[in-house]
């Protein structure tokens, strides 16, 4: 009954109309059925989730956010660390750059340019010399060198590039030279520079925080060390700042992250930018982990280091390693795997992921085709165990503008219309794709587990084979053929069942030594003939 007829009927007989509305439901296209149909949200990275939580905690504690300098001249390391500076600089990355060489234009080079088929006039030579002078002085960036050389010689960019490669190889062979600028290895380097500029511009106390990258030249990266990490650092600046401020800030910050109960222990490292005896490690107890873990360090900046920047206030600094906290909160054992799961992490596809990538290959595309598919399934279900030889009419009538006659048959003697495997349903369990029969008599251990714990894809062998038969009949009618017979015998692989699996899932199953076991006897035959 059509929708408008149901609405009309409801005015006379609501109950009957309501029941009829249930009959109007059509089975959706295979790709619009669960678990193929899936609505997913984007996934955030655990590291940035942790940064956001720490950032929110600082803001709730009344701290204002700041971005500290990332590029630090080595002079600041000496001012902050004193005689300890060389050891600190050993773990710093120095920035290097390519030098700007003097590039001469001798007779030999001019001849080489002319040999490349480029006309060289006095004006062009003068323009080229000016380009190289600007490059040497730094007025011209390396990005624009090819373009400017091409303009000077009045040639296309690809010819200008050939000139640079063949005539001026010294540009290609340049080696980087290090300067005095380092990448920030710890947030303290940036805090001293920032506080130097603002300590006398605001009312005390100052409560500031910064969450940003630091870089440390570790001997190697391992499960607990990366060469770049995030520091969630804060400072409290006032005329007088007791060490207990660090304890209170640590407590307020870490309680927001789910930690409870805190222990404070003197840090044995004793960095020279802290007042002796103030550098303190913070240990916190996490109820979910049920253990004590080190999560932060704080201390009071040394008046000697502060005096190097003209700062006469007292400063408490607390630092939290974001990766460390993220590992604790997510119970990760390897920081590389946590930060770079795409490189170090184990490749995992859930059964749900695989189910989304498994689908019927050939599926009817028209409403007539989908109707015929349902009739094939209905006929098979009704007569699957009929003794052969046998034949049953599936449909006789109009189909895509032509009259057809469709039958389900088995011509061999002493068998049945269908093989027993047609009743199987496809399950996915622990990465294995399995054909699970309706009965339990022949279950293997793997099939038993799949039946209890696996994901039912909703795909039956019968429906997959019926979909292919209906699709082939659509093809027959559209192409003008007179007859088609679709027969399936033994299922050994996905293609035997008219199923397809995306390459990603296939690589995963193969790489993880999982199984695709869909074997079974099918022996189904559908025949279609045109009738005018």
Curated annotation (Swiss-Prot):
Stored SUPFAM superfamilies: Class II aaRS and biotin synthetases (SSF55681)
InterPro entries documented for this protein: aa-tRNA-synth_II, aa-tRNA-synth_II/BPL/LPL, O-Pseryl-tRNA(Cys)_ligase, Phenylalanyl-tRNA_Synthase, SepRS_C
A biological process from GO: tRNA aminoacylation
HAMAP family from the UniProt entry: Sep_tRNA_synth
Top-level division of the source organism's lineage: Archaea
Gene3D superfamilies registered for this protein in UniProt: Bira Bifunctional Protein, Domain 2 (3.30.930.10)
Pfam families the UniProt entry points to: SepRS_C, tRNA-synt_2d
Protein name as catalogued: O-phosphoserine--tRNA(Cys) ligase
Keywords for the protein's UniProt record, in alphabetical order: Aminoacyl-tRNA synthetase, ATP-binding, Ligase, Nucleotide-binding, Protein biosynthesis
The UniProt record lists the keyword Aminoacyl-tRNA synthetase: yes
Organism encoding this protein: Methanothermobacter thermautotrophicus (strain ATCC 29096 / DSM 1053 / JCM 10044 / NBRC 100330 / Delta H) (Methanobacterium thermoautotrophicum)
Family (UniProt): Belongs to the class-II aminoacyl-tRNA synthetase family. O-phosphoseryl-tRNA(Cys) synthetase subfamily.
Catalytic reaction equation(s): tRNA(Cys) + O-phospho-L-serine + ATP = O-phospho-L-seryl-tRNA(Cys) + AMP + diphosphate
EC numbers on record: 6.1.1.27
């Amino acid at each position: 009954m059509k929708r408008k007829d149901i609405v009309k009927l409801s005015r006379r007989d609501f109950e009957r109309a309501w029941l009829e509305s249930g009959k109007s439901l059509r089975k959706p296209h295979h790709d619009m059925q669960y678990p193929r149909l899936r609505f997913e949200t984007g996934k955030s990275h655990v590291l940035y989730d942790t940064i956001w939580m720490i950032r929110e905690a600082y803001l709730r504690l009344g701290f204002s956010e700041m971005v500290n300098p990332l590029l630090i001249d080595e002079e600041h390391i000496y001012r902050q660390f004193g005689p300890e500076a060389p050891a600190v600089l050993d773990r710093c990355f120095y920035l290097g750059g390519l030098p700007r060489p003097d590039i001469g234009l001798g007779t030999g080079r001019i001849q080489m340019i002319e040999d490349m088929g480029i006309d060289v006039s006095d004006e062009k030579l003068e323009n080229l010399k000016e380009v190289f002078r600007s490059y040497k002085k730094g007025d011209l960036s390396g990005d624009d060198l090819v373009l400017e050389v091409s303009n000077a010689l009045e040639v296309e960019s690809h010819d200008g590039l050939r000139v640079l490669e063949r005539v001026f190889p010294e540009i290609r062979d340049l080696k980087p030279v290090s300067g005095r600028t380092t990448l920030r290895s710890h947030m303290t380097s940036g805090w001293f520079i920032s506080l130097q500029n603002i300590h006398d511009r605001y009312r005390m106390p100052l409560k500031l925080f910064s969450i940003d990258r630091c870089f440390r030249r570790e001997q190697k990266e391992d499960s607990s060390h990366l060469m770049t990490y995030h520091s969630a650092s804060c400072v409290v600046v006032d005329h007088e700042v007791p060490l207990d401020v660090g304890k209170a800030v640590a407590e307020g910050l870490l309680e927001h992250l789910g930690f409870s109960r805190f222990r404070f222990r003197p840090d044995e490292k004793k960095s020279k930018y802290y007042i002796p005896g103030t550098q303190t490690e913070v240990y916190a107890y996490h109820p979910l982990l049920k253990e004590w873990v080190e999560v932060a360090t704080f201390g009071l900046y040394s008046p000697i280091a502060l005096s190097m920047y003209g700062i006469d206030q007292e400063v408490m600094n607390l630092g939290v390693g974001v990766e460390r906290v993220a590992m604790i909160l997510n119970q990760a054992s390897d920081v590389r795997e946590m930060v770079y799961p795409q490189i170090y992490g184990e490749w995992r596809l859930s059964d749900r992921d695989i189910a989304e990538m498994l689908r019927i290959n050939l599926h009817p595309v028209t409403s007539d085709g989908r109707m015929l598919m349902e009739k094939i399934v209905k006929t098979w279900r009704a007569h699957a165990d009929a003794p052969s030889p046998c034949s049953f009419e599936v449909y006789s009538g109009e189909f895509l503008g032509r009259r057809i006659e469709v039958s389900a048959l088995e011509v061999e003697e002493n068998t049945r219309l269908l093989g027993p495997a047609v009743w199987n349903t496809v399950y996915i369990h622990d990465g294995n794709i399995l054909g699970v029969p309706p009965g339990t008599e022949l279950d293997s251990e793997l099939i038993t587990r799949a039946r209890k714990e696996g994901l039912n894809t909703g795909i039956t062998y019968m429906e997959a084979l019926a979909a292919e038969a209906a699709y082939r009949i659509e093809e027959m009618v559209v192409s003008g053929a007179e007859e088609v017979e679709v027969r399936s015998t033994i299922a050994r692989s996905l293609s035997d069942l008219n199923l397809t699996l995306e390459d990603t899932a296939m690589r995963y199953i193969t790489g993880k030594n999982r199984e695709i076991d869909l074997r079974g006897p099918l022996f189904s035959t559908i025949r279609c003939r045109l009738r005018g």
